[in-house]
UniProtKB/Swiss-Prot annotation:
Alphabetical list of PANTHER family matching this protein: ANTERIOR GRADIENT PROTEIN-RELATED (PTHR15337), THIOREDOXIN DOMAIN-CONTAINING PROTEIN (PTHR15337:SF11)
Key words, A-Z: Periplasm, Signal
Designated name of the protein: Thioredoxin-related protein DsbJ
Superkingdom classification of source: Bacteria
Spans through the membrane: none
Pfam families, A to Z: Thioredoxin_7
Principal place of residence: periplasm
The keyword Glycosyltransferase is assigned to this record: no
Compartment list: Periplasm
Source organism: Chlamydia pneumoniae (Chlamydophila pneumoniae)
């Protein structure tokens, strides 16, 4: 009131001087507020409120599930990564951030506690910390379930890259049939990074239908991985693949033999009853067909067979194949193989 009375008594010239003075006094405060905004991220506690802001701004949601008052890794990532200037600089203005806390020692508003329990169930959170990226339509883009030695800069860069890649894939999906095979392959690898299952499935179908070498290789590998190596479909894909490289110039026969051997060895370790000769049959077949022309891999294949026999306690067979490997190996690796030979001879 006193200030207003004084202002009323001022002349126009005096008012201009006073306005300048008041503005200059307020500048440091405004500047400090701007600096505070640029030095921190707003972490929303109310998920629905954050989701609404995400929809309005068409920005992705970055949700961190944490127990920051009792869980060591959560404390570490909060202090060293999420609060770091490098992380803030990279994600600020690009995400709507949500913090979902499961506290043990600090008080928490009951409706937020109940909300967080519901979110844990909704997103199937089994470990903390866990970070989920969601689109503004609440579609899950990516999930980080375990953290290693992330820094603020590399995590921030990764999150931005993931969102950008997801956007590229979303735009490419409707026009997938018009993409060249090289473009389709590039997008496929991008979809692998993001575990974009729908894109991967359709791209793989298109590539296999086009009889493309890369996609035939992928299809064969994936069928073997899910235990369908003996299926008619897998055998047809294998035949088409090998026919594309009859002379093994792309090492296709070697790769196929290795994949089949690894699958059979995995079955053996899982307790499937099969003779050792059945497990190594793909490698033996490769040696018989291409061993003489593929000297670079001959010794490697022989050592794989030797190692399998060792694991099966068949020392005599292991020794035979290790000796062949030694003879076929380049001089720089013979010393390593000779130590294995000494060990096998001693044990047998």
């Amino acid at each position: 009131m006193i200030l207003l009375q004084n202002i009323k008594r001022c002349s126009l010239k005096q008012l201009k001087v006073l306005a300048t003075l008041l503005l200059s006094l307020s500048l440091p405060t405004l500047e400090a507020a701007e600096n505070r905004d640029s030095d921190s991220i707003v972490w929303h506690l109310d998920y629905q409120e954050a989701l609404q802001k995400s929809k309005e701004a068409e920005l992705p949601l970055l949700v961190i599930f944490s127990g920051s008052d009792w869980n060591g890794p959560c404390m570490k990532i909060r202090k060293e990564v999420l609060e770091s200037p490098e992380f803030i600089k990279r994600v600020q203005g690009k995400f709507v951030c949500v913090e979902v806390e499961y506290l043990k020692h600090r008080p928490q508003v009951e409706n937020i506690r109940q909300q967080n329990l519901a979110l844990k169930s909704k997103f199937k959170i089994n470990e903390l910390p866990c970070m989920i990226l969601l689109s503004h339509e609440e579609r899950e883009i990516y999930r980080i379930g375990s953290f290693g030695n992330e820094t603020g800069s590399n995590l921030g860069d990764s999150l931005c890259h993931i969102v950008e890649s997801d956007s590229l894939l979303r735009r490419a999906f409707p026009m997938m049939t018009s993409l060249s095979l090289s473009e389709l392959q590039r997008y496929y690898r991008l979809a692998e990074e993001l575990s974009h299952k729908e894109f991967l499935k359709h791209a793989l179908e298109l590539g296999v239908r086009s009889d493309d070498y890369f996609f035939l290789s992928e299809k064969f590998r994936l069928l073997v991985e899910v235990g369908k190596m003996d299926s008619e479909e897998c055998q047809r894909i294998k035949k088409r693949l090998l026919n594309k490289d009859p002379k093994n110039e792309k090492q296709t026969h070697f790769t196929v033999a290795l994949i089949e051997f690894q699958e059979l060895a995995k079955r053996s370790r899982a307790g499937v009853r099969q003779d050792a000769s059945q497990v190594i049959a793909p490698l033996e077949s490769y040696i018989s067909q291409f061993g003489q022309q593929d000297k670079d891999n001959l010794w490697r294949v022989e050592m794989m067979i030797a190692q399998f026999y060792l694991d099966s306690d068949q020392w005599h067979h292991a020794l035979q194949h290790a000796e062949v490997a030694f003879e076929a190996a380049p001089n720089e690796v013979r010393s390593h193989i000779s130590r294995s030979l000494e060990y096998i001879r001693h044990q047998s």
